[in-house]
Amino acid sequence: MSGAAKTGDRVRTVYLIATEESGDRLGAALMRELRARLGSKVRFAGVGGHCMAGEGLASLFPIEELSIIGFAAVVQRLPMILKLIRRAVDAVLTAKPDILVIIDSPDFTHRVARRVRQRDPSIPIVDYVSPTVWAWRPGRARAMLGYVDHVLALLPFEPAEYRRLQGPPCSYVGHPLTEQFGSLRPDAAEQARREASPPVLLVLPGSRRSEVRHHAAAFGDTLARLKHEGVAFEAVLPTTPHLEGLVRAAVASWEVQPRIVVGEQDKRAAFRIAHAALAKSGTVTLELAIAGVPMVTAYRAGSVEIWIARRVVRPGTVILANLVMGDDVIPEFIQEDCVPDKLVPAVRDLLGNTPARRRQLAGFAKIDDILSTGEQTPSGRAADIVLDVMRHA
């Protein structure tokens, strides 16, 4: 078999655990690729969302039960979280799968993996999406040797980090965004709109409720200040259906009313015509870089989260696109720096043909080569490694 491991004739059980929407999408794609290789000789069990349900997974519990963010929220719901961890561990051990694949959400999935390894060391474990060991708590990489057999990395620099930190074997399989380059790149008409006046300014306050609440005021005030300074722009705010109500309420008092677009398709259409963006730091920075949209990034969180982060996060950029490019071309304004006095000049600088704008665009031009996985898709590469680990277990 080309790339895929031969696993014999018996039906293989793959147990997957994904507790967030992004992990749910990765899990569904992995299920499709494994089924393409094994046909009827594979069955799936585990925890997932709507995408994995579409591939036939009956989730152990709804992943919405874990849709929380912030230290305070975790503390308040800790008994429920611990109960779900125990439930997941017991379910894995009862299923006796040929492999356990944990997908992202390390605060939950790694606790499950450690307990499974302690109680049944015979079950091989693959971690799909590396924790950010290169940014904070690097000792986690070495600790993972005790309960993870292979890490599937979405970022090209991560395998070298695992070698440096003496962690488990790690392979770059590719970021799922590499399969979506076309949907983020403008056609001729969209490029013309991108270069026309007034320029489209994307406003991206976050993809979670707490993120929207933390960033809305500063972003709204920044738009108002730009308007008062005579800067021409059209503000567009993409959001998701489950956040639409919160976003509309948050921007109702803004002096500059953005055009709100809802859903992934309309979001990407907005990216294709955007001239610049003001964004909460996160995966969206890599999407914007792929789309060729220069950006200013910001990050605000609760005081407890920031206090903890400043004691454990390694110095340096936390912007995903900067990390991938290996160059700090995108400015970031964190916590007390996330204020209009600093955001306004940075955004204004990107709305013109400035050195700062040109420097970002030059960095974005390298993204395709850096993220390339050749002819194989990320989910295909991931499936082959999962099968290989299963074969050698």
Swiss-Prot record:
<comment type="function">
    <text>Condensation of UDP-2,3-diacylglucosamine and 2,3-diacylglucosamine-1-phosphate to form lipid A disaccharide, a precursor of lipid A, a phosphorylated glycolipid that anchors the lipopolysaccharide to the outer membrane of the cell.</text>
</comment>
<dbReference type="GO" id="GO:0009245">
    <property type="term" value="P:lipid A biosynthetic process"/>
</dbReference>
<comment type="pathway">
    <text>Bacterial outer membrane biogenesis; LPS lipid A biosynthesis.</text>
</comment>
<dbReference type="Pfam" id="PF02684">
    <property type="entry name" value="LpxB"/>
</dbReference>
<comment type="similarity">
    <text>Belongs to the LpxB family.</text>
</comment>
<keyword id="KW-0443">Lipid metabolism</keyword>
<keyword id="KW-0328">Glycosyltransferase</keyword>
<dbReference type="GO" id="GO:0005543">
    <property type="term" value="F:phospholipid binding"/>
</dbReference>
<dbReference type="InterPro" id="IPR003835">
    <property type="entry name" value="Glyco_trans_19"/>
</dbReference>
<protein>
    <recommendedName>
        <fullName>Lipid-A-disaccharide synthase</fullName>
        <ecNumber>2.4.1.182</ecNumber>
    </recommendedName>
</protein>
<dbReference type="GO" id="GO:0008915">
    <property type="term" value="F:lipid-A-disaccharide synthase activity"/>
</dbReference>
<dbReference type="GO" id="GO:0016020">
    <property type="term" value="C:membrane"/>
</dbReference>
<keyword id="KW-0808">Transferase</keyword>
<keyword id="KW-0441">Lipid A biosynthesis</keyword>
<keyword id="KW-0444">Lipid biosynthesis</keyword>
